[in-house]
Amino acid sequence: MDLDLIQDLPILNFPPAIKIRANTNRDDDGGGCTTPTSSDHKIPPTTATTPPPPPQKPRPPSTPSSLGIRSCKRKLMTSLSKYEIIVNKDEIERFFSSVYNQTMASSTTTAITVAKRRRSFRSCSRR
């Protein structure tokens, strides 16, 4: 049955094939583009096996700071002539000793209250 359908199809008429002649005047010596094969154009085997080094950032020109003198964001005062210190050494010692004494007194007070809280907590848990 399928063969009947194939026989009913019309025959297609194509135009005759165009014949293109091959170029017989072609020179293989250099008339076209070719890859150079001489040893001058080949990559040396040492370069082919090892990758090139990674690119590096160019270094800035040498400055006095890079020669050993490091610059800081904040410049240190070389002389105290800009500011006069009008604080006595005894005042400074009294200030720090008073702060130290206050912290010691407050730490012992908190230690006693913590101990009292623990005692009261333990007595409640025993009942």
Swiss-Prot record:
Main location: nucleus
Tissue: Expressed in the shoot apical meristem, leaf primordia and the elongation zone of the root.
Region span, Disordered: 21-71
One GO cellular component term noted in the UniProt record for this chain: nucleus
Subcellular location: Nucleus
Keyword hit for Cell cycle: yes
Keyword Cell cycle attributed: yes
Gene disruption phenotype: Multicellular trichomes with nuclei showing reduced levels of endoreduplication.
Keywords assigned: Cell cycle, Nucleus, Protein kinase inhibitor
Molecular function in Gene Ontology: cyclin-dependent protein serine/threonine kinase inhibitor activity
Biased composition (Pro residues): 50-63
One GO process term, biological-process aspect: trichome differentiation
Induction entry: Down-regulated by gibberellin. Up-regulated by zeocin treatment.
Subunit note: Interacts with CDKA-1. Interacts with CYCD2-1, CYCD3-2 and CYCD4-1. Interacts with CDKB1-1. Interacts with CPR5.
Functional description taken from the UniProt entry: Cyclin-dependent protein kinase (CDK) inhibitor that functions as a repressor of mitosis in the endoreduplication cell cycle. Inhibits the kinase activity of CYCD3-1/CDKA-1, CYCD2-1/CDKA-1 and CYCB1-1/CDKB1-1 complexes in a dose dependent manner. Cooperates with SMR1 and SMR2 to promote endoreplication during leaf development. Required for normal trichome endoreplicating cell cycles. Positive regulator of effector-triggered immunity (ETI).
Miscellaneous comment: Plants over-expressing SIM are dwarf with serrated leaves containing enlarged cells with increased levels of nuclear DNA.
Protein name, as recorded: Cyclin-dependent protein kinase inhibitor SIM
Species annotation: Arabidopsis thaliana (Mouse-ear cress)
